[in-house]
Amino acid sequence: MSGTFLVDEINYQKQQISISDPENCMVKRLLTFNTSGSPFSYGFSFYYTFLTCPNEVVIPVWSLMSIPCLSNSTSSFFATSNLTFSKLLPPSCQIVKGLYVPVDVIYKDVITEEKGFSTVPWLGNVLLEWSSPNCRGCEKESLRCGFKNKASLEVKYLADPPDETKSRLRPLIITLCIIGGITATCIAAIRIYNSERFVNQRRQNAAITARNTTQQPRGVVVTTGLDQSTIESYKKVELGESRRLPGTNGIICPICLSEYASKETVRCMPECDHCFHVQCIDEWLKIHSSCPVCRNSRS
């Protein structure tokens, strides 16, 4: 295990550490990842097959989601935990590697029941464990832990501070926690409220602007939009935590100029793959049949 990683979280009670790649491509690091020579090991792991396919290969029935940081203009990179699918690849696809990947145990049932290609729950970070030194007992009992001596990894419980000192600090700690909790809750509530108001206002303005464009002078040819069944036939994508979209799409809706949020649903144009909030693009397509970004229309 070598190289530089970002430490996202450390759980001392479970003795787990969550790490990620500074360049935001943890999958690439996993292909050469090895915990030998380090105190860390995999907790729960699952076997994945990594593969690459030319971009012209279309596999719609598999709902295949590519790994953006390893894909390029000619080929796309994928991963699957389904061994059956990995054996039924088109001839133009190639298996790059198969290996066990550390996965948070909360994804166990999702991966086991999966019928298609994986959404790669470990795309952002990897969860590792360590067993030595073992301080689980200390952490579980909220005690202090230390080494018995400098030449050993054995641990021992350390003496607690005098009761008098703890009794003086306890009221202060409780007061600070209450004040901090109330302040944080108020700030979070204000930010959420303002954010929702801002997003809703932008979307309303975008919808009004789209409607106003239909008010053409007499004698001017008015471009008709699409019917609802055609609009619904355009692909919809539910965003994950990373909010990544295929192609040149960013994390901002080009219509309302609001950032996408995780779990939001976007709709993509079939010819150019430009994506937008479902509410925004649906309003637009009722009036126009072309993409708001590149003006390509469905032939």
From Swiss-Prot:
Its main location: membrane. Pfam families: zf-RING_2. Pathway: Protein modification; protein ubiquitination. GO terms for cellular component: membrane. SUPFAM superfamilies: RING/U-box. A zinc finger (RING-type) spans 253-295. GO terms for molecular function: transferase activity; zinc ion binding. Keywords: Membrane, Metal-binding, Transferase, Transmembrane, Transmembrane helix, Ubl conjugation pathway, Zinc, Zinc-finger. It catalyses: S-ubiquitinyl-[E2 ubiquitin-conjugating enzyme]-L-cysteine + [acceptor protein]-L-lysine = [E2 ubiquitin-conjugating enzyme]-L-cysteine + N(6)-ubiquitinyl-[acceptor protein]-L-lysine. It is found in: Membrane. The chain crosses the membrane at residues 172-192. One of its GO terms (biological process) is protein ubiquitination. It is a single-pass membrane protein. Its EC number is 2.3.2.27. InterPro entries: ATL20-22-like, Znf_RING, Znf_RING/FYVE/PHD. The keyword Ion transport does not apply. The RING-type zinc finger domain mediates binding to an E2 ubiquitin-conjugating enzyme. Belongs to the RING-type zinc finger family. ATL subfamily. This is RING-H2 finger protein ATL20. It comes from Arabidopsis thaliana (Mouse-ear cress). The gene is ATL20.
